Protein backbone atom coordinates (compact mmCIF):
# COMPACT_ATOMS: atom_id res chain seq x y z
CA UNK A 1 0.00 0.00 0.00
CA UNK A 2 1.07 3.53 -0.69
CA UNK A 3 1.42 6.13 2.07
CA UNK A 4 -1.94 7.25 3.36
CA UNK A 5 -3.49 3.80 2.91
CA UNK A 6 -4.26 4.13 -0.80
CA UNK A 7 -3.02 1.76 -3.44
CA UNK A 8 -0.47 2.88 -6.02
CA UNK A 9 -2.12 4.15 -9.20
CA UNK A 10 -0.55 3.11 -12.51
CA UNK A 11 -1.42 6.30 -14.40
CA UNK A 12 0.44 8.56 -11.98
CA UNK A 13 3.51 6.37 -12.12
CA UNK A 14 3.21 5.05 -15.65
CA UNK A 15 5.34 5.75 -18.67
CA UNK A 16 4.86 5.31 -22.37
CA UNK A 17 6.54 2.39 -24.05
CA UNK A 18 5.92 1.63 -27.71
CA UNK A 19 2.53 3.33 -27.69
CA UNK A 20 1.37 1.64 -24.50
CA UNK A 21 0.98 3.00 -20.98
CA UNK A 22 3.02 0.77 -18.71
CA UNK A 23 2.01 0.68 -15.05
CA UNK A 24 4.74 0.80 -12.41
CA UNK A 25 3.76 -2.70 -11.33
CA UNK A 26 3.82 -5.52 -13.86
CA UNK A 27 0.40 -7.14 -13.83
CA UNK A 28 -0.36 -10.60 -15.16
CA UNK A 29 -4.10 -9.92 -15.26
CA UNK A 30 -6.74 -7.57 -13.92
CA UNK A 31 -9.81 -9.35 -12.52
CA UNK A 32 -12.94 -7.21 -12.21
CA UNK A 33 -16.03 -8.00 -10.13
CA UNK A 34 -18.41 -6.80 -12.85
CA UNK A 35 -21.51 -6.00 -10.84
CA UNK A 36 -19.49 -4.40 -8.03
CA UNK A 37 -17.91 -2.05 -10.59
CA UNK A 38 -21.26 -1.37 -12.32
CA UNK A 39 -22.81 -0.45 -8.98
CA UNK A 40 -19.99 2.04 -8.31
CA UNK A 41 -20.02 3.60 -11.81
CA UNK A 42 -23.52 5.06 -12.31
CA UNK A 43 -22.45 7.11 -15.36
CA UNK A 44 -22.30 3.87 -17.36
CA UNK A 45 -26.02 3.37 -17.05
CA UNK A 46 -27.44 6.85 -16.78
CA UNK A 47 -30.60 6.02 -18.75
CA UNK A 48 -30.94 2.31 -17.97
CA UNK A 49 -30.82 -0.07 -14.98
CA UNK A 50 -27.29 -0.59 -13.64
CA UNK A 51 -27.39 -4.35 -14.15
CA UNK A 52 -28.89 -4.17 -17.64
CA UNK A 53 -27.30 -5.59 -20.76
CA UNK A 54 -26.68 -2.03 -21.98
CA UNK A 55 -24.79 -1.12 -18.81
CA UNK A 56 -22.72 -4.33 -19.05
CA UNK A 57 -21.95 -3.60 -22.70
CA UNK A 58 -20.78 -0.07 -21.87
CA UNK A 59 -18.60 -1.39 -19.04
CA UNK A 60 -17.05 -3.96 -21.37
CA UNK A 61 -16.49 -1.29 -24.04
CA UNK A 62 -14.62 0.98 -21.59
CA UNK A 63 -12.60 -1.89 -20.14
CA UNK A 64 -11.62 -2.92 -23.67
CA UNK A 65 -10.35 0.61 -24.37
CA UNK A 66 -8.47 0.56 -21.05
CA UNK A 67 -6.95 -2.81 -21.95
CA UNK A 68 -5.90 -1.39 -25.31
CA UNK A 69 -4.11 1.46 -23.52
CA UNK A 70 -2.26 -0.70 -20.98
CA UNK A 71 -1.93 -4.06 -22.69
CA UNK A 72 -2.67 -6.00 -19.49
CA UNK A 73 -5.31 -8.71 -20.00
CA UNK A 74 -8.60 -8.08 -18.17
CA UNK A 75 -11.22 -10.58 -17.03
CA UNK A 76 -14.57 -9.12 -16.00
CA UNK A 77 -16.67 -11.60 -14.03
CA UNK A 78 -20.43 -11.33 -13.54
CA UNK A 79 -22.65 -13.33 -11.18
CA UNK A 80 -25.32 -15.33 -12.94
CA UNK A 81 -26.35 -18.70 -14.24
CA UNK A 82 -24.18 -18.44 -17.33
CA UNK A 83 -24.20 -15.72 -19.95
CA UNK A 84 -27.56 -13.99 -20.41
CA UNK A 85 -29.54 -14.92 -23.50
CA UNK A 86 -28.60 -12.81 -26.46
CA UNK A 87 -24.96 -12.48 -25.37
CA UNK A 88 -22.74 -12.74 -28.47
CA UNK A 89 -20.57 -15.85 -28.58
CA UNK A 90 -17.48 -13.77 -29.40
CA UNK A 91 -17.82 -11.44 -26.40
CA UNK A 92 -14.44 -12.59 -25.05
CA UNK A 93 -10.90 -12.51 -26.31
CA UNK A 94 -7.67 -13.46 -24.54
CA UNK A 95 -7.01 -9.78 -23.81
CA UNK A 96 -10.57 -8.91 -22.71
CA UNK A 97 -12.35 -11.88 -21.19
CA UNK A 98 -16.02 -11.69 -20.17
CA UNK A 99 -17.12 -14.44 -17.78
CA UNK A 100 -20.44 -15.32 -16.16
CA UNK A 101 -20.53 -17.65 -13.16
CA UNK A 102 -22.47 -20.87 -13.60
CA UNK A 103 -25.50 -21.84 -11.56
CA UNK A 104 -24.41 -22.53 -7.98
CA UNK A 105 -21.16 -20.53 -8.33
CA UNK A 106 -20.45 -16.88 -7.65
CA UNK A 107 -18.25 -14.33 -9.37
CA UNK A 108 -16.23 -14.20 -6.14
CA UNK A 109 -15.45 -17.91 -6.38
CA UNK A 110 -14.28 -17.53 -9.99
CA UNK A 111 -12.13 -14.54 -9.05
CA UNK A 112 -10.55 -16.37 -6.09
CA UNK A 113 -9.74 -19.37 -8.26
CA UNK A 114 -8.19 -17.14 -10.92
CA UNK A 115 -6.09 -15.26 -8.32
CA UNK A 116 -4.80 -18.58 -7.00
CA UNK A 117 -3.89 -19.79 -10.50
CA UNK A 118 -2.43 -16.55 -11.89
CA UNK A 119 -0.48 -15.43 -8.81
CA UNK A 120 2.31 -17.93 -9.51
CA UNK A 121 2.97 -16.00 -12.76
CA UNK A 122 3.10 -12.52 -11.21
CA UNK A 123 0.96 -9.72 -9.78
CA UNK A 124 -2.82 -10.10 -10.06
CA UNK A 125 -5.05 -7.07 -9.48
CA UNK A 126 -8.66 -7.54 -8.35
CA UNK A 127 -11.18 -4.70 -8.57
CA UNK A 128 -14.04 -4.99 -6.06
CA UNK A 129 -15.76 -3.17 -3.22
CA UNK A 130 -16.70 -6.43 -1.47
CA UNK A 131 -14.69 -6.31 1.79
CA UNK A 132 -14.81 -10.07 2.41
CA UNK A 133 -13.60 -10.68 -1.14
CA UNK A 134 -10.81 -8.14 -0.67
CA UNK A 135 -9.56 -9.99 2.42
CA UNK A 136 -9.67 -13.35 0.64
CA UNK A 137 -7.83 -12.03 -2.42
CA UNK A 138 -5.11 -10.47 -0.28
CA UNK A 139 -4.70 -13.76 1.63
CA UNK A 140 -4.22 -15.50 -1.73
CA UNK A 141 -1.44 -13.06 -2.69
CA UNK A 142 -3.43 -10.75 -4.94
CA UNK A 143 -3.62 -6.97 -4.92
CA UNK A 144 -6.99 -5.25 -4.52
CA UNK A 145 -8.21 -1.87 -5.70
CA UNK A 146 -11.50 -0.29 -4.77
CA UNK A 147 -13.89 0.32 -7.62
CA UNK A 148 -13.51 4.08 -7.11
CA UNK A 149 -9.70 3.91 -7.53
CA UNK A 150 -10.07 1.79 -10.64
CA UNK A 151 -12.73 4.06 -12.16
CA UNK A 152 -10.43 7.05 -11.65
CA UNK A 153 -7.56 5.16 -13.29
CA UNK A 154 -9.70 4.09 -16.25
CA UNK A 155 -11.02 7.61 -16.79
CA UNK A 156 -7.53 9.13 -16.54
CA UNK A 157 -6.05 6.55 -18.91
CA UNK A 158 -8.81 7.02 -21.48
CA UNK A 159 -8.52 10.82 -21.31
CA UNK A 160 -4.75 10.60 -21.74
CA UNK A 161 -5.15 8.14 -24.60
CA UNK A 162 -7.67 10.41 -26.36
CA UNK A 163 -5.37 13.41 -25.89
CA UNK A 164 -2.42 11.50 -27.34
CA UNK A 165 -4.45 10.29 -30.30
CA UNK A 166 -5.69 13.82 -30.97
CA UNK A 167 -2.13 15.16 -30.74
CA UNK A 168 -0.86 12.45 -33.11
CA UNK A 169 -3.69 13.17 -35.57
CA UNK A 170 -2.83 16.90 -35.55
CA UNK A 171 0.83 16.08 -36.20
CA UNK A 172 -0.06 13.84 -39.13
CA UNK A 173 -2.49 16.42 -40.53
CA UNK A 174 0.21 19.11 -40.45
CA UNK A 175 2.76 16.75 -41.96
CA UNK A 176 0.34 15.86 -44.76
CA UNK A 177 -0.52 19.53 -45.43
CA UNK A 178 3.18 20.45 -45.72
CA UNK A 179 3.61 17.89 -48.52
CA UNK A 180 1.02 19.59 -50.74
Residue ranges and their predicted role:
Residues 27-32, 36-180:
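Nuclease catalytic cores that cleave nucleic-acid phosphodiester bonds
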Residues 1-24:
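N-terminal amphipathic/basic-hydrophobic helices that include classical n-h-c signal peptides
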Amino acid sequence: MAPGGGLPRPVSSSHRHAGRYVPAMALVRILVDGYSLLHSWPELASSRPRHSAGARDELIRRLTLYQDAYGTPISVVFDGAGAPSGTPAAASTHAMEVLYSRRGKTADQLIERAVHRFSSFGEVLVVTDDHAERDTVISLGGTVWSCWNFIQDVENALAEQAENISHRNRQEKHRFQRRK
